[in-house]
């Protein structure tokens, strides 16, 4: 009878570690594909906000340069990626309010990757709007 009691205690002691491991896995899975972008520059010079970001490794572009005048997109330039599409995105959102650009671009998927170059732009803009840029 004592062996059964100790065996039960051992099993119960092991269960929380299994559950804890499962919780970590769930947290990891909730991280969205494409969240590995990095804002490398975010500063205001003479009233223009300059944002440079390294997008997710899941997309073809390797850099996004954004200029904002207040809450309006002044220009967007992608480095690498689909040249015509990248130029098209920049031309289409020039003059658009940042919130509108985010709303239109966020969630666009490319080839089942869970993100895209337009989605990365939306994510970068969204993250940038939540922080204060350096002022020079």
Feature annotation, model-predicted:
Residues 4-14:
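Bacterial N-terminal signal peptides
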Residues 12, 29-33, 130:
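Short amphipathic alpha-helical "recognition" segments used for binding
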Residues 18-31:
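Cleaved targeting-peptide boundary
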Residues 28-56, 66-67:
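N-terminal secretory signal peptides
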Residues 48-50, 54-135:
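Active-site- and interface-proximal helix/loop "cap" or "latch" segments in soluble metabolic
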């Amino acid at each position: 009878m004592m062996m059964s009691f100790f065996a039960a205690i051992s099993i119960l002691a092991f269960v929380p570690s299994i559950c804890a491991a499962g919780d970590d896995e769930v947290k990891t899975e909730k991280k969205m594909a494409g969240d590995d972008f990095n804002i490398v520059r975010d500063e205001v010079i003479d009233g223009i906000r300059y944002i440079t970001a390294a997008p997710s490794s899941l997309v073809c572009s390797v850099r996004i340069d954004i200029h904002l005048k207040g809450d309006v997109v002044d220009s967007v330039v992608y480095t690498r990626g689909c040249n015509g599409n990248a130029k098209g995105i920049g031309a289409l959102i020039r003059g658009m309010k940042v919130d509108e650009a985010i709303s239109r671009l966020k969630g666009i998927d490319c080839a089942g990757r869970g993100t895209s170059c337009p989605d990365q732009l939306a994510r970068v803009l969204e993250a940038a709007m939540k922080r204060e840029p350096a002022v020079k």
